[in-house]
Amino acid sequence: MILDTKADILVTHSFHFNNTKMHGLSGHLFEVLDYYWYFKNKGVNVKCLIPEVVTKETFNDFIKGHYSVDFDLNDMYFLDTKILAIKARNILVTDGGYWFLNQYKSKLLGNVFSFACGPSFLESEDKPEYVTFLADHKIYPGLGINYTKKVLPHLNHIPGDKPFAHITKNCRALSESQIKDLIRDYPDIVMYSDYLNIQNSTNKPIKNFNFSKYVYTPIMRHFDCSPRLIIECRILGIDFDLWNINYKDPGLERRLETDLDQFILGASDNIINYFN
């Protein structure tokens, strides 16, 4: 099956090509939605491919649990079956690493753009030349177009009374001893997780940022390409702790810079100028 969206811009991330559907809820899904909303409000014929987690039936409830603005369900593709290729005039991949973009070149039919994401951009020379990269040069010096990935600020917030952590197997998994230490330090913490089955964990996303504090936990690769929940907490005035971060992470350090405005996606953003 070839998905011909007939869109000027299709926004997606790479997980729809993964047979295992193992990634679960991640910030890349919200990046897809953020940039869809931005392009839509610029009058662009834009579509989204939602790879996993959200279905057509759960989409509206999912949106209301995060955003304070509306999204057009008719612009969303939810696919339960594998597709051979996706087609649009321009395709924006929010999480494309070199491996994915090289492996699936034949499946991306259109002008391909990708946000830089992960340490592979700093370590690999196997750059896919058919892709236009949008990369923050403070993290990825000299790669593609200098562009800082941003966060849509239109967020629903219902304050909560417990700290929160995001513990998922994709890249944020913690060892058993780390989990015990985390609960010791935050006895009433609520953890969203797709693999834990303990009293403090839930496999249901926390809606409306309903927590008192975000506890940012270590990631295995020591490189968080765009920790958006840090920015969302800063936008909403929610406290956050950096728990056991005893390593240097250029992506995290970038998001902790004082100037919050540089990370907020607004109407004046210039990303639209790079698409034809």
Spans of features found by a protein language model:
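N-terminal pre-catalytic "stem/leader" segment of glycosyltransferase-like enzymes
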Residues: 1-99, 188-189, 198, 227-230, ...
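Residue-level signal for short, function-critical loop segments
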Residues: 15-17, 52, 118, 170-171, ...
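Conserved catalytic-core segment of nucleotide-activated headgroup transferases in glycan assembly
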Residues: 21-38, 42, 137, 142-204
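A short acidic, amphipathic alpha-helical/loop segment
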Residues: 35-38, 102-108, 125-129, 177-185, ...
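Catalytic core of nucleotide-activated saccharide and alditol-phosphate transferases
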Residues: 73-179, 260, 264
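Short acidic alpha-helix that forms the nucleotide-activated donor recognition element
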Residues: 84-86, 201-212, 235
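Short, acidic/turn-prone active-site loops that include or flank metal/cofactor-
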Residues: 117-121, 194-198, 220-221, 245-246
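Acidic donor-binding loop of glycosyltransferase active sites
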Residues: 209-222
